[in-house]
């Protein structure tokens, strides 16, 4: 009953008419983007939960050499309080030199836990190989790992991943094309020719004719002032213009792993009749002991005895007339007591029969 209520409520919610949206809610300015940074470093100060992998030892020796410490030849350091880690961060657009960003630290070796560790100075590089930030600091780890003397182990959450809030300082800014050219381009999050044209029409209605033009299903180009300060004020105005996005294409999204089914607003069915029955095959393997008669010279053996039981649920047939909506489809399927897996099978069969007006996407 709860499943039926949730499905019907979700369908009704999706069927509500679209509301006006601000431009910044459905699009982003081209060139105004974040960048990914990554680096390799060492976490020290671990309470014996580190590692002794070859690359960790090599990195540890290189660090000592940078500090002017040369180990005797053949010396193998014990690095159970050290772990090799990968450090990654996201550099937001317009982040300035000297500002700080959050980082995530992940073990890449056999360390059991990073709890209590400190990340040493680590260079964070971009795709071009340049250093844009430097990370360092004490980790905050949500998980834990405990090992007993008898080898028993208890692990909670993920102890090999930690975060450092404001753990990296930006040393170099990323060039941004925001202040260049005569136009600003807005890229829709969901490509749609109708929505792109409506966005351009809304800007032209607000600012004047020929100020905006839809380039394709994703991009809308808007004429903007060259002066940077005026451009900021101009963008602040444009991104708050409201318009009515177009209704998207009719789609049914099915997640075969979780059983989640999302049906879009415009999905309809052509005339069709459906019957769906469930068959269950149960195989039970029993073992019996065959005991020979006394003094017969036979051997005691174990003989398998299989029991196979087949049960089939009563199937019902229901018919859809032209123009049936998604709500009626869900109600009809729920009335026959179908589970989400049954609904997925029905939807796939309807699509193969050409009875669904829309896309069926299985993820």
From Swiss-Prot:
Kindly list the GO CC terms recorded for this protein.
bacterial-type flagellum basal body, distal rod, P ring; outer membrane-bounded periplasmic space
Single Gene Ontology BP annotation: bacterial-type flagellum-dependent cell motility
Query: Which InterPro entries does this one have?
Result: Flag_FlgI
Q: Where in the cell is it found?
A: Periplasm; Bacterial flagellum basal body
Cysteine disulfide partners in this protein:
none
Principal subcellular localization: periplasm
* Signal peptide from the UniProt entry: 1-20
A GO molecular function for this record? structural molecule activity
Question: What keywords does the record list, in alphabetical order?
Answer: Bacterial flagellum, Periplasm, Signal
Q: Outline the subunit composition.
A: The basal body constitutes a major portion of the flagellar organelle and consists of four rings (L,P,S, and M) mounted on a central rod.
> Belongs to which family?
Belongs to the FlgI family.
The UniProt function text for this chain reads:
Assembles around the rod to form the L-ring and probably protects the motor/basal body from shearing forces during rotation.
Which HAMAP family does this UniProt record tie to the protein?
Answer: FlgI (MF_00416)
Cited PANTHER family: FLAGELLAR P-RING PERIPLASMIC PROTEIN FLGI, FLAGELLAR P-RING PROTEIN
Protein name (Swiss-Prot/TrEMBL):
Flagellar P-ring protein 2
Supply the source organism for this entry: Photobacterium profundum (strain SS9)
- From the UniProt record, report the name of the gene that encodes this protein: flgI2
